[in-house]
Swiss-Prot record:
InterPro entries: DUF5382_C, DUF5382_central, DUF5382_N
Organism the protein comes from: Caenorhabditis elegans
Record-given protein name: Uncharacterized protein B0228.9
Region (Disordered): 1-21
Ranges of Polar residues composition bias in the record: 10-20
Membrane-spanning intervals of the chain: none
Domain of life: Eukaryota
């Protein structure tokens, strides 16, 4: 499978207004569809379908397919094709305003066998729309080359599929120089995700597949620079797990690191044109880890990054706005060297007890607002916060809760919190602050 370039329209190429342009457009889009499984190329080609286009294939001879049916046929064929070679275009007529064209290639199938493919089409100039429109498409191929039995394995080789995902992420959506992404770009990626996929995005509410696609489109629409793309995969029983990370630069030059986990499995797809069920590789689980700020700040400002995240995620648990609230808060702590206390004077607890205690805090309160932040040392992220909390009762009486935090920067340059203390009584505040001062900072 070759790397797929954006469709001609996205490249700024004009509508075809003569037979040469139409022949080139048909080939470019068909290669993108069959060799790259690109929905964007299909949508581009469909812009030049006549309203009364006739589409005939060897799967259902004698019946014209609708445009959605045609797209499904192409999806099926591209699932079987692994790679196209010897691509050629020609025509049987030589007229600037009309073309009777032929598009041929050699394809290697998922069974590693080579076979020839041929498409013919007719198109003519529409002077009202000032572009060529395709009136007829015919796939007169011998359909017996395609699998006719329900396979026990997907049509597409898994290595080919994983490479396709890598190419789509690294060279399609998150290009080093950036690209003006549209919803359509991410909708195409959504075609590779099951409709009932589980989507977990840190700091966001639970969302379905369509909401996730819109989320990605909105988040990355105006990003102009990506760097350090990393793609890895491991086999997990019969499934595969993909980890993809990218660093993106915001308009204010702040740099963030996003990491996604995609779990892939074999999923059934019904192909009505020959009444068969086939298996495809599909993403059925998506996890987006909490975004990491990787900007190189001056030392005096460095700790403000973790300060803001701690306070936001602490309140996020109580406000209940985050689908993965607890994990996003726990991710800020060092699992191996965290000590914390629910009250000064009580026995210090370790990392594995944070979740249990925060469950009690969340059950007690319904709303959280940061009232005051007292900074002792931003270089070491040493600060305490007063949270104004509303009780989870009908009266919603308010209480203040003081919590102190201390952190450090690990060898990878990431901030981690390793000290946290809850102040329970006003009379202990001085002792509370003294304890924070005496905490041994990890540098």
């Amino acid at each position: 499978m070759q790397s797929v370039t954006p469709p001609p329209t996205q490249q700024g190429k004009p509508d075809p207004t003569n037979s040469d342009m139409m022949m080139k457009r048909f080939q470019e889009d068909m290669v993108g569809i069959l060799d790259g499984r690109s929905r964007a190329h299909f949508d581009d080609l469909a812009n030049y379908f006549h309203s009364k286009i006739r589409i005939c294939t060897c799967f259902e001879p004698g019946r014209s397919l609708s445009v959605p049916e045609f797209q499904h046929v192409l999806t099926f064929i591209s699932g079987y094709y692994q790679h196209l070679t010897e691509v050629r275009s020609d025509r049987w007529t030589d007229h600037p305003n009309y073309i009777n064209g032929i598009f041929t290639y050699t394809a290697m199938g998922s069974d590693r066998k080579n076979s020839d493919g041929k498409w013919t089409y007719e198109a003519s100039m529409d002077w009202n729309q000032n572009k060529f429109l395709i009136e007829y498409i015919w796939f007169p191929y011998n359909c017996s080359v395609f699998p006719v039995k329900d396979p026990s394995e997907p049509l597409e080789d898994v290595d080919n599929y994983l490479e396709r995902v890598r190419t789509k992420l690294s060279s399609g959506l998150f290009l080093p120089d950036g690209v003006d992404q549209t919803l359509q770009n991410f909708e195409e990626f959504g075609d590779w995700i099951t409709d009932d996929a589980i989507i977990v995005v840190c700091d966001e509410q639970k969302m379905d597949k369509n909401e996730f696609i819109k989320y990605m489109s909105t988040r990355y629409h105006h990003i102009r620079k990506y760097s350090n793309n990393q793609f890895d995969h491991v086999k997990n029983n019969q499934d595969f797990e993909i980890t993809f990370s990218t660093t993106w630069t915001a308009d204010n030059t702040t740099q963030f690191r996003d990491t996604y986990i995609f779990r892939v499995k074999k999923a059934e797809d019904y192909f009505p044109e020959n009444d068969r069920l086939y298996l495809l590789w599909k993403i059925y689980w998506v996890t987006k880890r909490c975004t990491v700020d990787v900007t190189q700040y001056p030392a005096v400002l460095d700790g403000s990054v973790i300060l803001g995240e701690v306070n936001k995620r602490f309140c996020g648990m109580i406000d209940g706005e985050n689908w993965d609230v607890y994990q996003s808060f726990l991710d800020l702590f060092d699992p191996n060297d965290t000590k914390w206390g629910s009250c000064v004077g009580k026995r210090e607890q370790k990392y594995d007890k944070i979740r249990e205690y925060m469950n009690k805090v969340v059950a007690r309160y319904a709303k959280c607002v940061v009232s005051e932040v007292r900074i002792r040392n931003l270089v070491h992220a040493d600060f305490s916060t007063t949270f104004l909390l509303s009780r989870a009762n009908e009266i919603q009486e308010q209480e203040e809760l003081d919590v102190g935090f201390v952190g450090y920067k690990n060898k990878n340059g990431h901030w981690k919190i390793n000290r946290m203390y809850f102040e329970c009584e006003e009379s202990k505040k001085r002792k509370f602050m003294d304890n924070l001062l005496n905490v041994r900072l990890k540098c």
